[in-house]
């Protein structure tokens, strides 16, 4: 289950359209299975595509919408009936087969669009932001539905989205794109834990990673990241041969909000405490987002709901040093393990 993710205009939908044969491939080779597909007509590529808009025929029933492609390919009535009913059962829309699209909700229409693709039994499913027209609750439900379909069918899915939640929860591998270039291809967890550059680090994760300009210092064989009046130790697990090239230079310290703590037990054992002023708090139910600043440097922390911090409070925070990242300030590439 491949996810193409990135901001608007990064080239993810264009890539999908090239796979589908709707755009010319300017360079490189496209293989579908073992077949070189650059010059294969779209109708012969054995792919099925689901778009952001459902593209259902309003005058046809759900059954006829799902069966339409099979009828064009001259399948027998018995085979069409078998495939449509099986897809409807997988998607839980058996009771809607006699209805017209206007009698369905947005989520049901999206299921019909998926069903129309499933009956084709293609080698590859291409999905171009299929959930963006749905409300938040339906999106979450359909994410689960599509993941179940993938597990059941075992077919290749290539899914385009700008929503990193969809990317992280659905994909087995994620392709992060920016300005037409692939930034990183990885599993969701590895992408989250070990981003290759600041763009990936900031794009994956919500709230996004904190970035702090700092100077790398070395004293007695120990490295620290210095900013304001603070000297944040670099743990041994993050040290590599490249670090010496950056001593005395400006770098960027990266730390995710969930690795910034204000809990007393974390403060008590912290190697480095930082004093911060609370600007805003957001109660999310199971957690609180603290928006604080360290002498003007903004930091976001995702803390336990037991936190008593209020806007205007001066508090102490600590970083989970084992989770910090260091980036080259010029190239924005990661320089830590």
Give the location of each predicted region.
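Helix-to-loop junction immediately C-terminal to a conserved catalytic motif
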Residues: 20
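ABC ATPase nucleotide-binding domain helices that frame the ATP-binding cleft
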Residues: 13-16, 112
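The feature captures the beta-strand-to-loop junction immediately N-terminal to the Walker
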Residues: 5-7
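Glycine/charge-rich catalytic "coupling/switch" loops of P-loop NTPases
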Residues: 222-278, 298, 308-337
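ABC ATPase nucleotide-binding domains
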Residues: 40-199, 203
């Amino acid at each position: 289950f491949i996810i193409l993710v990135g901001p608007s205009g990064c080239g993810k939908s264009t890539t999908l359209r090239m796979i589908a044969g709707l755009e010319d491939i300017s360079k490189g080779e496209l293989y579908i299975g073992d077949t070189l597909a650059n010059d294969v007509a779209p109708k012969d590529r054995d792919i099925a595509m689901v778009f952001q808009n459902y593209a259902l025929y309003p005058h046809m029933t759900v059954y006829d919408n799902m069966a339409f492609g099979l009828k064009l390919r001259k399948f027998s009535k018995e085979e069409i009936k078998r495939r449509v009913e099986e897809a409807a059962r997988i998607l839980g829309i058996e009771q809607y087969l006699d209805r017209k699209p206007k009698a369905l909700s947005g989520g049901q229409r999206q299921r019909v669009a998926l069903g129309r693709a499933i009956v084709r039994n293609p080698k590859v499913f291409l999905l171009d932001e299929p959930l963006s027209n749905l409300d938040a609750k339906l999106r979450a439900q359909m994410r689960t539905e599509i993941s179940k379909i993938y597990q059941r069918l075992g077919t290749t899915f290539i899914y385009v989205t700008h929503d990193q939640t969809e990317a992280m929860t659905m994909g087995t591998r994620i392709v992060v794109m920016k300005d037409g270039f692939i930034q990183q291809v990885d599993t969701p967890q590895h992408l989250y834990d070990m981003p290759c550059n600041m763009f990936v680090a900031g794009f994956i994760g919500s709230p996004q990673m904190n970035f702090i300009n700092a100077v790398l210092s070395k004293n007695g064989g120990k490295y620290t990241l210095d900013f304001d009046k603070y000297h944040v130790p670099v743990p041994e697990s993050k040290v590599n041969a490249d670090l010496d090239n950056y001593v005395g230079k400006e770098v960027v310290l990266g730390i995710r909000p969930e690795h910034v703590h204000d809990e007393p037990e974390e403060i008590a054992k912290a190697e480095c405490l930082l004093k911060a002023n609370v600007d805003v708090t957001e109660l999310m139910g199971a957690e609180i987002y603290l928006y604080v600043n360290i002498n003007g440097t903004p930091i976001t922390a995702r803390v336990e709901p037991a936190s008593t911090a209020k806007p205007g409070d001066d508090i102490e925070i600590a970083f989970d040093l084992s989770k910090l990242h260091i980036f080259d300030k010029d190239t924005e590439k990661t320089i830590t393990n």
